[in-house]
Amino acid sequence: MISMAGFEHEPERAWDEYDWERFLQQQDHKTEKYMELLEKYLDDPNRDQIIAREMGWTQLLEGKDWTQEVDALLEEDGAEERAEPPDSFEEHSLYRAAFALTVWIDQMFDADATLQNEPSAVKLATHAALASAKLAAALSGEDVDEIGMTIAYLKRALKAITLSIDGAAALLRERRISVAQHAVLLQRLFQVRDGIITLIGEYRGEWRRRFGSR
């Protein structure tokens, strides 16, 4: 569950893709800050209190026992998960194509272990996996009010797959993969990229149909 605390918006207006992008950027910043603090104070006996103070998590500093509330929330989340259709995003053809791409790249790494130390290969693999994860996030919800969120995640998936394309081109320039391997990579990468672009257009059209051009 994503916390929207501290993010101001118009309560009566559905968020569009730009509202969601701003929100996701804020979450990225908070995650980066948390990871930096965790690394800095990893061995400090007062680590949790220090991080809570730095992150502004005042409820954790008040000494309140949140165990029962957390357990209740987990039970609610579990009930919601059981009520939802299983693996809905995994059935989407675009997600399957993105996942198949990551499997193909893994197999290429298995065939040539030296690629694992190549920055261009790491860029290719990392961003292909990231694109797959962003697609999973985009395709997991069918809520009308979350069309903007879906588009925002699709745009992030598009950025990731574009960086993977750059990584593939660099590997060819560096002669770390063959022309034939690059051709297969491009076919798979562009299949995912074009699918993302098509989906963004479809969701934007649905947004305009439901909410107008605002």
Q: What is each model feature region?
A:
Residues I2-R214:
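Amphipathic alpha-helical assembly/interaction segments
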